[in-house]
Each structure stands twice: as C-alpha cells, then as structure tokens.
C-alpha cells in the first residue's frame, strides 16, 4: 500500500520539499472540459470465483477483467443510463446498468453463469432443440443476420441457459427486475428466465425473422411466492425480453402455463432472441437511504442492490450518496452497497428489513438507515501555516512565517489510512530523534511525503481568505504532482520574500482547475476551514540547561497544544494538555546538540472537508510562534 502524506513530523517541515529533480509546470488558462469518469468492479462466477478475460463493454469503451476479476472502464462520459455488457466464451452474457454523475468512479459488479447447453442444426430444416430443460422449435429458413438483417443459410449453433430465479442463478440475469410494461414502469416477479444465443458458421450473431417466430418452452417455479402471486396450469402470463440498448426488461406479448409430472412450464413465441422472462409486473413501492464511508462522507456512484423474496433492484447513489430502489410491499429486503476503491470491492449489507410502506415516490419511501462501508476514501491534504517567528532573543520583533502547500492522491481503501495520525502522539508524550526517527513513530499509513499515488488537481490550486488569493502552480517532484507556495524568489540577484497572509479566525476557501487525466473535476469550496487561535510564547527565547524546560504560553484553544524543537539534525515533538504552561522533560531534549536552535508552540487543527468530487480531504492548519532556543 502506498504511503500517504497526512501530517508532517514538525511544523517547520510542513510544505517543504526537496527541490532536486523538481520542475515547475506553468499554468495556462483553465480549459473547460466535459466531465469524464470511470466504471470499475468485479466479475465472478456463481460460486464466487473471479473470472478473468471477460470482455466488458459500453457503447464507447471496452476493457477486460484481470486475473482477480477486476476491471476499469476509462474515459466514460457521464450518463444516467449506461448499459454495460459482460461477455466471456462459455458463459451467458450479462448486462448491468449504472449511472455516472461526473468525474468519480462508479461501481458495477456482476456474475456470469456457465452456458446450459450447446447444439448445432441446419437452418434450412425445421428443428426442435432441447437443452437445459428448455425446448425450442425453429421454423425452417427463419434465420437472419443479427446485424445486416439479411437471410442466413447454413449451420446454426445455439447456446441455451435457463435461470431458476429462486436460486443464486438470478445473480447472472441482466440488471435487476425493473421493467417497462404496457401500462408503464413495473417491478417484475420472475418465475423463470432463459438466454438463447444463435451463431452462424463464421461466428456472426443470428436471430429469427419476426414473421417466423420460434416457439419456446421453459421450466418455471412458484418458489416461495405468496399464493396471490402463484401461477397454475391454464393461466396466461406476460412475456418480457431484455433490451440491451435500453438496459431494461420490456413487455412483449403473452404465453401459456402448462404442466406435467415434472412441474410447470411456460410456452410462448419469440420473434427475436435475447434474454426472455416469465414474469408478473407490479407497481412497486420504494425504499430510500444513504451510503457513507468510514469517516461518514457520502459515497456517490456506489452500487446498491436491494434483494428480497420478491424484490430485485439495483441502483446507483447520487452525488450526495442517496439512493431510491424499487421494493415489493410485504417483502423482507436486504440492502448491499458496494464501491470500487483502490482496485478492490468494498461493501456492506444492511437488513433484512420488512417493507411495510406503500409509497410510490421518494417522499413516501421506506426509510433505510445509513449503510456505512468500511472504506477509506481520503484523497488529499491542504496544509496551512499561520506562524510568527522571533528574530532574536534580545528583541520582541517578529516576522510572518506563513506557508501553504497541498497534495492529492488516489483514495487508498484500507481503513487504516483513515486513522487520525495525531492519535499516535499521546498527550504528555514527546518524540526525540532525527527526522526519520520521528517519522517512524507515526503509523506507516501516515508517513509524511508525497505518496506514489499522488495525482493532479489541475494546473493550479488556490487558497483564499479576506486578505487575498494564493494560487500555487502545479509542481512535479520527479513525476509526482504537488502544490507549494514559493516563499522566496530570485529577482535579478536579489532574494525576494513573498508569503501568504493568514491570521487566526480567517475563513479559508479553496479552488482548483481540475485535471481530466487524473479524474478530478474543477473544484471550489467556500469556508472549507477556519484558522485556529494563534499560540504565543510568553518570552522571546528559550534556554535549555539540561533539566526540564518550563514553557509558558498564551492564546491557546482546544484541549491540547503542541511543542517542537530542532537543533542540527535532532528534533523534538511533544503534545501537552492545554493549561497555559507545560514542562518538556529533560530526556526529550537530551539529544539536541549544544548551541542554538529553534522552538515552536502551536495549535494544530486536523479536520476533514469535502475535496474534489466530494472525496474527503484533510485540512491541516498550524497556528503558533517560533523563538530561538539556546541549548547549554
């Protein structure tokens, strides 16, 4: 797992980066680009084993699953009805539908079912094929090319796969059971499904002439359906086919229920071939809720599957993490939310919950408690330094030492990356040693530095307050992007200092140009954070004489206050309970070499805020003072 920058070991190190191998990328005017996003997920067989080399396709993009069954479709244009097709030799094709809101990664997982049976016959002859308990009667010379519509003559290969909807086989059926009936939208209750695919001798997809339909008989079952829903011999029932273009089940005609000693069957005519379904359509009720991540931020474009005895519905969360799914009143329904982060599937299930609502709109929906997925989606940090430095021990004169930096990264997934790094340093504890030794005290997930997964938020990133706007150009350390305010510049041989101005109580706003290559859209948030109270030493300098160092200070706020010191290569970092004074233990200072160094005292605010595309980011704000430190 990549190491993520969350907090610097010392204030004086925050926002400071090695200038070696660093190139500044000068910004052009931001270019308005259309949003693009990604769709990711996993494909499994019905036993839960990952399927590799599955072709995953939309109208414009294709990808193949890896060995672990994962896939990512890149550069997908947002749409509220993106149909995804999943195809692999030896398996019945499947379809899912997802909504992509903007720049984020939408989630779509699916399962494929092995083909039930394969047969070959001559297109010029009347043929009856029975495979997987399904019987199909084809008329002679009834076949046409599925693309051109031209008549086809030659051998035909047929693949037939039957689905019993009372089993896990339903997971391999297209989308969910949302449908468009003759009287409007419906929620289907299925009794049996079949996928029939026809191929010519050259692998071309075939279908039948609509004027010469095939006759199909499939096994059906009432399962554990309520008596009101059960079918009997002699009943008629609607036929429904799945439309790959529209991504929904469509009512077509009617068929007849027959039966024998082997059970019930559904017989109907098929004027074309795709997935077919024996169903009843009902006006559904609805259930609504929200999906959040480990730190409580809404998860947009998560996949939510609502499944019960009569309910099968899959939907996508909106930009605020909310969803509405179709449910059947009187059903017990489980709600499973999934999101694709860091190349892994993260999910959580809530339920089963009894559906007693009869609402037909989101305002009347059965309320579902938040589904919290244990996934870390923190994607960056903005570091602000509100800082004053005393020039020498004999003067009260101070200079501003404010600073600013930011870095963004791919969300890691594992919740260890969401642990508050400040919790590693206990109240009353001090760390001493070199920079590397102090850093090693933090959990590995919080080590400072630019992470290997760093990504660009655009050509520039800007922080604003009442005093001005501070735009930082994107800079690269090697190939890793970050943003840092350039405090010093060389103008004709003169070193010019230019610092941002921050003061306690300032409200900060942020904005960024966005970067389509990193799937970050243009971003602007007002009042994202407030500068905390600025802590000041009670004296202009400190002297360490070998014993404990008593430090008095003013203007702290909150429960804790931080102290840092540095001399040569040695450093100290402490955390104390806020009481107006603290004592730095002698052992913590013993590693500092004799001579002069520096000490700082500060409030440290580490909060989560909405970042690019709604992902949580840290705002890390230091507010304090530094003074000379004499070590005897």
Residue ranges and their predicted role:
Residues 13-15:
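C-terminal motif of bacterial Sec signal peptides marking the signal peptidase cleavage site
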Residues 17-20:
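Bacterial signal peptide processing site
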Residues 25-29, 39, 68, 109-131, ...:
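Proteolytic cleavage junctions
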Residues 30-52, 286-301, 382-394, 556:
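Structural motif
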Residues 37-39, 45-60, 67, 77-79, ...:
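Short, ordered, surface-exposed loop/turn motifs in non-cytosolic proteins
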Residues 58, 77-103, 111-113, 328, ...:
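A short, solvent-exposed loop/turn motif at the edges and junctions
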Residues 153-162, 166-167, 174, 530-585:
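Short helix-loop boundary/capping segments
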